């Protein structure tokens, strides 16, 4: 029997009358009750279903290159993987990978590494993954973090490791079609508190929640 994974944000959607769907072995809220928030203004989405992998060690970068994975050249930066995936370099020798909706490089990397090899060690990644999008995104970030994301050049593809409302996060800026957005990852232990706080601020700014239906196609 195949058991579905549960998002660390699953309970946060119970009051939103979601339409549940399965994506990558996890129940996800493809739509929320009523109308989804206007993504152009300010919207939050749960993308925790996307497969992740991690690795670190003095030979991690060389091992990734040998697997055909594009490696960010600098610490605290990221590159795109095929099919909307992401690889972030966290410091000099640790890497975080996430597949896009149709990608598989993070999954293949995790399987290939197994329990590790000389100088390369697997890191279990079960992060809650959140998308923050819309014209008022930087206003929300300004209220929750001391990093001024509005001044960061998105073309430099920085991977920012910082704290938001007391929770350690990884943040990158990327783009939906014609719309800038941020991807945020945090420890699943703090996911409910983190989401509830962001959603409260987003609601005050005229935003809300969107389902994954239009994001994972």
Please annotate each region the language model reported.
Residues 1-217:
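Basic, glycine/lysine-rich polyanion-binding surfaces/domains
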